Amino acid sequence: MADLRILVSIILMTNAVLEKGGCTGPPGPPGHPGPPGIRGPPGIRGIPGLPGPPGTPGPSVKCPCHRQSAFTVKLSGQLPSPSKPVPFTEVLYNAQRDLQEDTGVFTCRVPGNYHFLFDVDLHHCKVTVQLMRDKSSVLEKHQVSTKEPRSLSGMLTLPLHVGEKVWLEAKVETEKPEQARVTIYFSGFLT
């Protein structure tokens, strides 16, 4: 009977081992790689890279930056003659000498866009001021002053070519020449 017990024990153990899949054998070969997983979140930002090499030099051009043209002049103490360029009595700035000081005529030496401005203070007179460009009026302003001093201003931007001329003409009318006073400032500069 003891043999039967041993035999039954062996059979029961064998069944238990077989139900669990049998005995563990040696490991098999590695399997094939699986599909890629889900993309993870981005990592932290890295440090900046080194500077790149210098680029190739650009084309050379002549810069007109050094070319300038500007003036400011003043007339005071006398009344200007009509239909003639105003002869200014004081030069406040004319470093490039583009305004001919004895005639009051500006001659363009550097082509480009110019701002021209004039301011007139008047008393006891009527004044008409014209900004002239090569004998054509491009801006005209009028003002009348009886007892109170008045002022008159004008500004215009003109594109000019080399050799073109610009000046002011002023016509002054008054019944009291001894009391009439006119002061004119005229400026121009290349933009």
Curated annotation (Swiss-Prot):
Keywords: Collagen, Secreted, Signal. InterPro entries: C1q_dom, Collagen/C1q_domain, Tumour_necrosis_fac-like_dom. Residues 1-16 form the signal peptide. Residues 26-39 have a biased composition (Pro residues). It is found in: Secreted. One of its GO terms (cellular component) is collagen trimer. SMART domains: C1Q. Residues 64-191 form the C1q domain. It holds the Pfam family C1q. Residues 22-61 are annotated as: Disordered. Its main location: secreted. Residues 22-58 form the Collagen-like domain. It comes from the Eukaryota. This is Protein HP-20 homolog. It comes from Bos taurus (Bovine).
